[in-house]
Amino acid sequence: GKCNPSALFQAPITTSISKEAEKLAQNLSAEVRGSDMLIIWTDCDREGENIGYEVAQHCLSKRRNLVVKRARFSAVIADQIHRACMNLVDLDLHAVHAVDARQQIDLRIGAAFTRLQTARLVPLLHVDRMVISYGPCQFPTLGFVVDHYRRVQAFVPEPFWFIDLRHKTDTHSSAVEFIWDRKHLFDEHIVKILHGRCKEAVEAQVTCVQCRPTSKRKPSPLTTVELQKNLSRLTGMAPKKILDLAEALYQCGLLSYPRTETDQYDNDFDFVGLLDKQRQDAQWGALVSELCASAAGATVAPGALKYERPRNGRKNDKAHPPIHPTAHANDLRADEKKVYDYVTRRFLASCATDALGEETKVCIEMGGETFHTSGLFVKDTAYMKLFTYEHWSNKSIPEYRERQRFRPSTLTVKQGCTCLLYTSPSPRD
């Protein structure tokens, strides 16, 4: 029937068992008749707590004296299941009511604004029997998409100019590119004046040569957002599909619970025990054995991997640890293997050390303008032997000395153009 959309904010809400869940409810009713205790084993997040409460309420309606307890775990593995069973707790009613409140807010806002939009917009569109729905989560996201689209459409590329200085030596096959410290300017005339001063100077002079140790940080503990973002970029899989596959692997006992924003491990987390389960793997088993030997205090051979506890982040939801492998896996399907391999390699790499190198920075001056370049010598790729999704390569440059003078092999003005830092939307049909 018809009603004022605002009335839906006060209308009573009724709950019932859906047709799809009727057999499940019947099964619970039958099982609870001869039971004294109900243990809730749903996922250990707010949604799982709410579902567990619904199950408990249904069972209590059939057996009032039933004892209800909650098992908390993060992975479907024997150790955690036994520990959860020995440390049963009560349901967290705060989490239950929080989900109830969110569901009611979503329902009321969605129903009210859907009715309002449909009533006001359908006559303007001259269509019949059309519903224009509103979702409290989806609508703001749609706003981001529209805003992004408008920025892309409004973007106007702007030309800029810069000085391109290169130096070719007999010791290296390719010329060294020196980056202008001003980067670029939007006034061609000014750039040409500065370029002219450089040409008048004829020679460039080395003003500074600095060598310093540098490193590339190993990956941090894995959260849901990082898993979806990085693996989607690496494989092209949709973020939802990645999470669905991770949940399937969790249900098989191969991964920990994949819905977590925690990037910190507890102090008593058993890293070595999980590493030991991966020693049999044909791809990374030998490298994991090096980590295990290092963790046990054995003398590490030159070039071998060294164990180091993962570096903690800043977030801890106190519910689940970061995503990690809980068992070794064999015979996975193609996409499942991509998800499992990424999670496992990232966990293993987080237990190794940072990659180490030495960076050389060279600064020069020519005609009052300053330029710089840098070289890199990688000493130890460390964690990247396991985390093959990242690379760090040597960048060789000639040996320069302070106050050394040389003539550039290239000294020109080049033009560039500003561009969007994100991909433009594909053409519409």
Model-assigned labels for residue ranges:
Residues 1-17, 129-247, 251, 284, ...:
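Long, highly charged, low-complexity internal segments
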Residues 31, 58-62, 84-91, 107-115, ...:
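Conserved, well-folded catalytic cores of nucleic-acid-processing
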Residues 42-44, 229-231, 259:
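Short glycine-centered, acidic/aromatic-flanked micro-motifs in structured strand/loop junctions
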Residues 426-428:
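Hydrophobic heptad-repeat coiled-coil signature
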